[in-house]
Swiss-Prot record:
Protein name (database record): Thiamine-monophosphate kinase
Chain positions recorded as Mg(2+) 2 binding sites: 60, 89
Catalysed reactions listed for this entry: thiamine phosphate + ATP = thiamine diphosphate + ADP
Family: Belongs to the thiamine-monophosphate kinase family.
Biological role: Catalyzes the ATP-dependent phosphorylation of thiamine-monophosphate (TMP) to form thiamine-pyrophosphate (TPP), the active form of vitamin B1.
HAMAP family named in the record: TMP_kinase
Residue sites binding substrate per the record: 67, 278, 320
Binding site for Mg(2+) 5: 227
UniProt keyword annotation of DNA-binding present: no
Miscellaneous note of the record: Was identified as a high-confidence drug target.
Residues holding ATP: 136-137, 162, 226
Length: 333
């Protein structure tokens, strides 16, 4: 906890002392909504415009000590992360996020200033994409729980599904891979070097705008890397009935960027690149040239549905599952 965070914890009234409605008023007062929000907080529900009559909706949750730690992250970091991971799901559909609805649970003795900092982080991240926080709920519970529902607009484009990949197309990524997993390992091992990697675990950096750009040029299928590259590509392979073959050479830049951190930890960087989640890069399949900012990392072949690396099965840990068992870390040849 930083000096500033300690100040928030010691000088602020608690959520219980203020009461639910006073806390909510503090969190929403003076916030400017984007033009797509026709009615924000203050009524029974919000009203958000849907430009082409369709709405893209996604929900995700963060639970303290499962998805974030308050001895690593500031409340503002948690707020930014909660919005970023939901916005990435909207991006992966080829849409843009326009509004977010937030649920927050915390112990009654939580300083109200910490809740305010959480919402500040949410507004900061939402502002990066021109979206707003339009409502939510506040409850008392034993630990912090943050639930975010994202609302998005396709702006007249067709949605990009997981099921559209076809043999003969190329696989491309925009964004960086393995950074969050490397940062997590550094945090767990108490290594204070590699500040940027440690930061990337706390606050991901989705490639905002690139989902819509991919949809505009006819991306066949797309997903954001939340659970790990291999795990998320398996969703596309199974939904589309195709085989995906990744190129290790095309991913070497990600490996090289993590080599120094891996050396400090005495480990191999490849599992971070292939299996590490929470980077929220976008991966998509294209028939023609890939859009600016994207890089080709593999190809799509006829089924059966599998994900390979240089034509071979990856035998190590393949990615996060909320109810899965821990696995070994694996290696690349």
């Amino acid at each position: 906890m930083t000096t500033k965070d300690h100040s928030l914890a010691t000088e602020s009234p608690t959520l219980q002392q203020l009461g639910e409605f006073a806390v909510i008023d503090r969190l929403v007062r003076g916030r400017r909504q984007p033009a797509t929000v026709l009615l924000g907080p203050g009524d029974d529900a919000a009203l958000v415009s849907a430009g082409d009559g369709r709405t893209v909706v996604s929900t995700d949750m963060l639970v303290q000590d499962s998805h974030f730690r308050l001895d690593w992250s500031t409340p503002q970091d948690v707020g930014r992360k909660a919005i970023a991971q939901n916005a990435a799901d909207i991006e992966a559909m080829g849409a843009r996020a326009t509004a977010f609805v937030v649920g927050f649970g915390a112990p009654a003795e939580t300083p109200a200033a910490q809740a305010s900092a959480l919402v500040d982080g949410m507004w900061e991240e939402a502002g990066r994409i021109g979206a707003g926080i339009v409502g939510g709920d506040l409850v008392s519970c034993r630990q912090w729980v943050v639930s975010v529902t994202a609302i998005g607009d396709l702006d007249g484009r067709a949605p990009v599904l997981r099921s559209g990949a076809k043999a003969g197309s190329v696989l491309a990524v925009v964004g960086e891979l393995g950074r969050s997993a490397a940062g997590y390992a550094l945090w767990c091992n108490g290594i204070e070097d590699f500040a940027e990697l440690r930061r990337r675990h706390l606050v991901p950096q989705p490639p905002y705008g690139h989902g819509a750009a991919a949809a505009a040029v006819g991306a066949q299928a797309m997903i954001d890397v939340s659970d790990g590259l291999l795990a998320d590509l398996r969703h596309i392979a199974e939904a589309s009935g195709v085989r995906i073959d990744l190129s290790a050479a095309a991913l070497a830049a990600d490996r090289d960027a993590l080599t120094a951190a891996a050396t400090a930890l005495g480990t191999d960087p490849w599992p971070w690149v292939l299996s590490g989640g929470e980077d929220h890069a976008l991966v998509a399949c294209f028939v023609g040239p890939v859009p600016a900012g994207w890089r080709t990392i593999g190809r799509v072949l006829d089924g059966p549905a599998r994900v390979l690396v240089d034509g071979e099965e990856w035998t190590g840990y393949a990615g996060w599952q909320s109810f899965g068992e821990p696995d070994n870390q694996g290696s690349l040849g």
